[in-house]
UniProtKB/Swiss-Prot annotation:
Organism classification: Bacteria, Bacillati, Actinomycetota, Actinomycetes, Mycobacteriales
Similarity comment text for this entry: Belongs to the chaperonin (HSP60) family.
One GO term of the biological process aspect: protein refolding
Record's keyword annotation contains Nucleotide-binding: yes
Protein name from the UniProt record: Chaperonin GroEL
Positions contributing to ATP binding: D22, G23, T24, T25, T26
Amino acid sequence: YEKIGAEMVKEVAKKTDDVAGDGTTTATVLAQALVKEGLRNVAAGANPLGLKRGIEKAVEKVTETLLKSAKEVETKEQIAATAAISAGEQSIGDLIAEAMDKVGNEGVITVEES
């Protein structure tokens, strides 16, 4: 079961990165908690299929709530503010906003360590 759980957590992190580009740590912690509590409940006699259905319903509700509260990031200033929060530094947010302004929404920005 451990290998299956590790593979699932790895897949959660990959999908989160592919879809959102951020939040992999949060997704990994949540997935680990779900696996741990799920196994604990199954060991205590809970129906695994019932747990799965409950998790799926919870995912639907969380997704619905997140989509309702999501805000479009469109302007250069909004991009800079969002990137600064993610990077933890305003100057990096400004650089990312400038790069996005140059390449457009469909462009690719590659960041490398120097």
